[in-house]
Curated annotation (Swiss-Prot):
The keyword Mitochondrion does not apply. GTP binds at D17, H18, G19, K20, S21, T22, N135, K136, I137, D138. Keywords: Cell inner membrane, Cell membrane, GTP-binding, Hydrolase, Membrane, Nucleotide-binding, Protein biosynthesis. Belongs to the TRAFAC class translation factor GTPase superfamily. Classic translation factor GTPase family. LepA subfamily. GO terms for biological process: positive regulation of translation. Required for accurate and efficient protein synthesis under certain stress conditions. May act as a fidelity factor of the translation reaction, by catalyzing a one-codon backward translocation of tRNAs on improperly translocated ribosomes. Back-translocation proceeds from a post-translocation (POST) complex to a pre-translocation (PRE) complex, thus giving elongation factor G a second chance to translocate the tRNAs correctly. Binds to ribosomes in a GTP-dependent manner. It catalyses: GTP + H2O = GDP + phosphate + H(+). It comes from Rhodospirillum rubrum (strain ATCC 11170 / ATH 1.1.1 / DSM 467 / LMG 4362 / NCIMB 8255 / S1). GO terms for molecular function: GTP binding; GTPase activity; ribosome binding; translation elongation factor activity. This is Elongation factor 4.
Length: 601
């Protein structure tokens, strides 16, 4: 079939909770992709974690067949369900590169949110034809006309032919399918040209080995053919090709314009670089397709097993997750306080939480997580440049020329009654206002903020100030020089490397006092006095003392000479002095996490 006019490849883009996965469910149901008895909510969110949190983490693909009412032809629709959260923007960019058009789903009661904007701009950059869809028009609070105007004002899309639907009840789903067929362009490609297929995603299946998700641009991928990975130069014979309906369905071949999966008995996903081009080993394509820009981990934290004998299990588990999620990185590290573990890099905080939860769930591990930090650039006096992932490793200030930290461009959309508090929060976090515009009763503020300031609990604070109405999206902009210092935390005069952090000099004293105060409440009392100190270099900037537990050694003295009591008390004093010298202070796991939260709410 060299005619590609019957194929439509499209993605669904939306903010979290605007009904993207529900719409995908309805499209699958309407096109008969799944029998009624197999139908379940969020059909494409295959991970338990995705279903529980109601978010999409991995992009999924489905092939559907739809007979158009307008011309009676049967069309092949390839749907990519994409994540909506800012941390998974990388997954979104890959999905968009594999499609020619998108459905933009906007909640008719809530309107355009910050992440809708980010994903729409990505789709426009990818050259997509975009169909606006207003979801949840059956809600009493829905205001379709106002939201249409907002889409035109904020994004600049024509909404005169936007489709109003209710994904929950299935209202007007057929109109969405008609719009897909009539308004989206078919893919371009030549079946007879040398094979070129874009590797969109890959994951590891314990029975099948590595499953590769591809979008064929030119030529054909057939069973039995030898495929060549252009980036790595590896050659593998293809065992199976097929499509998802959403179940796996084997076919003989995948030709230009189609999406599907390929299996070739590959054991390691390291051989499958996402964004690579697959071609026929016997008649390779002259050049590779443009890939994706590599995702760069933004947030780093240490993961340590509670039981040190689990170290190897943790290593294997991380390697397995890396198979499915090429966007996170890890390297071994050791800590005096926590033993051996790994320093892991993530795309953002939600990504970090998800990976940690998957490790605990899928591999049964008990983990200690250190505070998240960002990557600082250390410019040394001898002209070298160091990238610092762990605050505990910060070099001696004498050897430092200057330090740079990453800044982000953050877009915040918020109802205007909460704007004042939101702007105050951004200023408190060293933000620089770049833009402030209004669309109806919502304001859109654009700020430059240091990533270090938002990485911890900025999102939580934003939500609590705005009663959950604000939405937030950011992209890493660039590095800028800052006056940063390392604050060490000493417990019983011993530095605890896992609690060290880097802060701006103006905030170091305040943060140090805050953390010492918290640790005083979090560390249980011992039989001797425990001093907790925060220090910059050799200068102590804050101190708290945990009082000793008192054991009443004179309880068994009834009356008699006072010197008898004094002797016992002196003996106890000597013992406590010795204990203070050699005693070990136990710091509970909860102290590591709670001590480093920025705010007290």
């Amino acid at each position: 079939m060299s005619d590609l006019s019957h194929i439509r490849n499209f993605a669904i883009i939306a903010h979290i909770d605007h009904g993207k996965s529900t719409l995908a469910d309805r499209l699958i149901q309407t096109c008969g992709g799944v029998e009624a008895r197999d139908m379940k909510e969020q059909l494409l969110d295959s991970m338990d974690l995705e279903r529980e949190r109601g978010i999409t983490i991995k992009a999924q693909t489905v092939r559907l067949h739809y007979t158009a009412k307008s011309d009676g032809r049967t069309y092949q629709l390839n749907l990519m369900d994409t994540p909506g959260h800012v941390d998974f923007a990388y997954e979104v960019s890959r999905s968009l590169a594999a499609c020619e058009g998108s459905l933009l789903v906007v909640d008719a009661s809530q309107g355009v949110e910050a992440q809708t904007l980010a994903n729409v701009y990505q789709a426009i950059d990818a050259g997509h034809e975009i169909i606006p869809v207003l979801n949840k028009i059956d809600l009493p609070a829905a205001e379709p006309e106002r939201i249409k105007q907002q889409i035109e004002d904020v994004i600049g899309l024509d909404t005169s032919d936007a489709v109003g639907i209710s994904a929950k009840t299935g209202l007007n789903i057929d109109q969405v399918l008609e719009a897909l067929v009539l308004r989206l362009p078919p893919p371009t490609g030549d079946v007879d040209a040398p094979t070129q297929a874009l590797l969109v995603d890959s994951w590891y299946d314990s029975y099948l080995g590595v499953v590769i998700l591809v979008r064929v641009r030119h030529g054909v991928l057939r069973k039995g053919m030898k495929m060549l990975m252009m980036a790595t130069g590896a050659v593998h014979p293809i065992d199976k090709v097929g499509v998802f309906t959403p179940k796996m369905l084997e076919t003989d071949s995948l030709s230009a314009g189609e999406m599907g999966f390929v299996m070739a008995g590959i054991k390691s996903v390291a051989d499958c670089q996402i964004g690579d081009t697959i071609t026929d080993d016997r008649a390779p394509a002259a050049e590779a397709l443009p890939g994706f820009k590599a995702s760069i981990p933004v947030v780093w934290c240490g993961l340590f097993p509670v039981d040190s004998s689990d170290f190897e299990v943790l290593r294997e588990s991380l390697a397995k997750l890396r198979l499915n999620d090429s966007s996170f990185e890890f390297q071994a590290e050791s800590s005096a306080a926590l033993g051996f573990g790994f320093r892991c890099g993530f795309l953002g905080l939600l990504h970090m939480e998800i990976i940690q939860e998957r490790l605990e769930r899928e591999f049964g591990l008990d983990l200690i997580t250190t505070a998240p930090s960002v990557v600082y650039r250390m410019h040394m006096t001898d002209g070298t440049l160091l990238e610092l992932h762990n605050p505990a490793d910060m070099p001696d200030p004498v050897r430092l020329d200057f330090v740079e930290e990453p800044w982000v461009k953050a877009t915040i959309m918020v109802p205007d009654e909460y704007l004042g508090q939101i702007l105050a929060l951004c200023t408190e976090r060293r933000g620089i206002q770049m833009d402030l515009t209004y669309a109806g009763s919502r304001a859109m503020a654009v700020y430059k903020l240091p990533l270090n300031e938002i990485v911890f609990d900025f999102y939580d604070r934003l939500k609590s100030i705005s009663r959950g109405y604000a939405s937030f999206d950011y992209e890493v902009a660039d590095y800028a020089e800052s006056d940063l210092v390392k604050v060490s935390i000493l417990v019983n005069n011993e530095p605890v490397d896992a609690l060290a952090f880097i802060a701006h000099r103006t905030q170091a004293d305040f943060r140090g006092r805050q953390i010492c105060g918290r640790l005083k409440d979090l560390i249980p009392r011992h039989l001797f006095k425990v001093p907790i100190q925060a220090a910059i270099g050799g200068r102590v900037i804050a101190r708290e003392t945990i009082a000793a537990m008192r054991k009443d050694v004179t309880a068994k003295c009834y009356g008699g000479d006072i010197t008898r009591k004094k002797k016992l008390l002196e003996k106890q004093k000597e013992g406590k002095k010795k204990m203070r010298q050699f005693g070990k202070v136990e710091i509970p796991q909860s102290a590591f996490i709670n001590a480093l939260r920025m705010s007290d709410d």
